[in-house]
């Protein structure tokens, strides 16, 4: 390898890496693979990327570095040949409700510019195209005011702009004006006016003060002309005691008199007060308390806890009980009356209050009783007021459980002011454009009819928008709309959006480190993704991709296999080179699967199920097109389809939420369908997603699975603990007593970074052990409680082998391929796939009924094919016990093992939402309309060939 064209790593020891030496070619597509926990991410992200980032930070000035903090040097002897590094992972999804696909990709900025430069304004009321106004037309409009109306003619020289505005104020003085209105307050220009520099101000010069009469027309025309000259064609008529009138020399509707100022990009921004809808401030939605969530089951009475809202749960002797009794006395119900039997008036008073009417309240306490009269606010107004006013995040979260998002009645979810929405290009406004899919937007831009002049002005903008939309399409995201909220994107989607954005930036000589970009991607779209990564490489960049996808490996220039096992059994370079090189290495598990020496078998027979089924009738949420789907029970079911075809909507939004509401009493609102039939055959539903098992470093696999409670009890039963009088609570790091008080049992201290995510550093007192010295003196088999938390699951399985209660829970973690994680590993450091498997292990450890429905969303995320093999066996075990497992999956090794496939499509977005194929994998593979079938057929054929050789 050319010494000038390589990245050389010497002595990498980060996490479980064992003094790794490695050479990587530059300007190539490199795939790092290996078992989950083998050390791939430690090498790619925590060593190579971290050192590239640290070196960049050190090149900045000390002033800039004070805001960024000190980056720790990775545990590595030396890395040479490193370029500036950019990480594209899945943990940086925006949760800001104002972020959309359009804003994240910056395409929306170009659209705002496009609508500002070549947009055609219309009247928001009549839809008529708006043209320029003359001074005479403005005068005629003002003269329509009633006789004797007093008004001021103002010239708005500054509109909502930061700064002291000294220059504009001096110019007004020199021009001979006497008064000025600043932010609604009048000032004399002869006095000194000091404005706050960092606040936005509006400055309007008072040109004239007039009263409507027969003789004022000439003077009014002169004053308007003066104001227009001062304020670049704008004038404000401030009617005393009435609504102000604004005129523009540019645009106004002749029929309704609505003026539109000169079009600017900020008019089309929903994050700017000039463009945002005034009612919802640009969010497009409101959070409102949902009566159906406050009282989810009207068959129950108040005493039976029919009301499920923060502060309003029924309890004897509480203020809520006193209120309910008073309402019952006034409106004729008791605490034992089912809510469904309440009169309309009674239910309205309970939920929305008694208005001005005071009702008799009977107060009882240990000091006696008394009567007083008071108005009742109502449960819903009370909750909404508390939600607005509270500073407690916990209270907000509690109230949010009974709230739902409702479309803004003013803008109908479109986020912008009526005047902004009345501007069109090619006949559609900016919100309509953003509601189209990326594929439809590309078609629209290519066919939009605009004038020759507008085409010349808009050509460079069209070019930028088309390029960026093309990049989104090339990474398999053609089904997304630009108006879609960034928070609703999956990890894989947000990562591919950032990948498309990087291609748009066209940087060269950069090191990109990617974390499983193929997650959530159908095999059809995976080919596009690989082509995109090659395109980034061909620009002159190096790509290091942590990936398990076989197609990506076969297309890579160079593969690094890290292993051979996970955790302490990993951390070595097992093989490096081409696919052929990897296949030759006998100890490479990746090579064994790539060469066909090992493979995931196709079952000889498919399960028949129990003959019963769940049926979703006429599902029409999002892009689902009134489909009716059967989910046969007692089978392993795979729901497949290209990205955006409606899989998550059908399974998570409709089926899971409906079952959870009916069987578990969940309060989430299910997606729209006519009915879900067959629920009587199921007694429990368990959804296992990739959300974190906890949002702070205090949460860990041991606490989540409940095994830590058993371990604490075990420690409290030791001779040493009994002598000292220590109970299980002594060994908790969440309560005072046994924990280190310096870090309050966290083992780490949180340092708030004002411009960046918080940084965690080990506690100086306990050195990260979480407990005080006395607690750590108690040992079980020569290990302290802190030592146990530092053990991997695999080590703990051996250590606690003789304690069945603990061993059983640990064994399930081992079964799902998590033998390498530590018991006390912070939840914040677990990937989405790892968190999902911790939840799966937690459910496996419970006693099941044989009538449970398990729903998993892409459980193979982050899994090597060997781990997938193990996971499939775990899922088989659940189904063999009589349960039903429904999996949303793209991984063909899982799909080929399914008993039943439901394939949605045929495309994503508006081109999806229908059932393309159902049946066994063999039946779907023969369906010519199914993209899944097309990729499944060769996989089944290869598996049959390998099994026959075996």
Residue map of PLM features:
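Conserved phosphate-binding elements of NTP-dependent enzyme cores
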Residues: 1-950
